[in-house]
């Protein structure tokens, strides 16, 4: 877009750091929450997630999908969302994982299709989790 080509997009992003988004954004071609909806949707998401006593792998993925669909910040939502997933896996003794660039398209498909087919995202995450487990095995770290 013209704003970014003139270098003004980055100026706006710096001003919005730490705040919820002020202008609409998108992820992987999917619509996200409008700026005026973000606070309520985030409150609902956090209340729902924190209301669960124990979280499992699917709960963490479900939270992530919902977070990404809200896309609460102007920029950095993917990194923040994936970092939250990593942290939650550690918190609940689930082997964490990192979505690498070569699997991003499968990851985005998984986000998009979550409501119809959870397997796309689940399988993508389990694949990279297996890679992480191989590193743990190599260094003889129990999990």
Task: Name each model feature, range by range.
Residues 1-12:
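Single conserved hydrophobic/aromatic residue that forms the stacking wall/gate
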Residues 6-8, 17, 27-28:
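Feature targets compositionally biased, intrinsically disordered low-complexity regions
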Residues 13-19:
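Proline-centered turn/helix-capping motifs that create local helix->coil transitions or kinks
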Residues 22:
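Conserved catalytic-core motifs characterized by acidic clusters
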Residues 25-143:
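Phosphate/pyrophosphate-binding active-site loops
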